[in-house]
Regions:
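Post-HEXXH active-site segment of zinc metalloproteases
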Residues: 1-18
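Surface-exposed, polar/charged faces of alpha-helical domains
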Residues: 4-8, 34-35, 39, 72
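Short helix/loop segments within enzyme catalytic domains
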Residues: 16, 20-57
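Pan-zinc metallopeptidase signature
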Residues: 52-101
Length: 101
């Protein structure tokens, strides 16, 4: 049971790191707007949704198991990317201080 708890805790920390990376990617995207083509932002949000753990597990024919997630849900990934994009502020990407992911 202890080893399982450690794995669940490690997964939860990994989710926070991955969502922070999504947010930082959003900041990058907002700073290179002149280099992006029309539709790139929507494509990035769609990609974030497609690589959410819940989506990937469903695609594999399984019921999503949140305790096994290592990247966050589709909704979380898109929301944190958008948060970085809209704010442009690294301080808004602190997933470890966030009460809600």
């Amino acid at each position: 049971a202890r080893q399982q708890a450690s794995k669940v805790e490690a997964n939860a920390l990994t989710v926070r790191l991955e969502l922070m990376a999504d947010c930082l990617s959003g900041i990058w995207a907002t700073n290179v707007q002149g280099l992006m083509e029309k539709g790139d932002l929507q494509e990035a949000l769609n990609a974030a949704r497609k690589i959410g753990d819940d989506h990937l597990q469903r695609q594999a024919g399984r019921v999503p198991q949140p305790h096994t997630f290592t990247h966050g849900t589709s909704e979380q990934r898109a929301r944190w990317f958008a948060r970085g994009y809209e704010s442009g502020d690294v301080g808004q990407c602190d997933t470890f201080a966030a009460a809600r992911l």
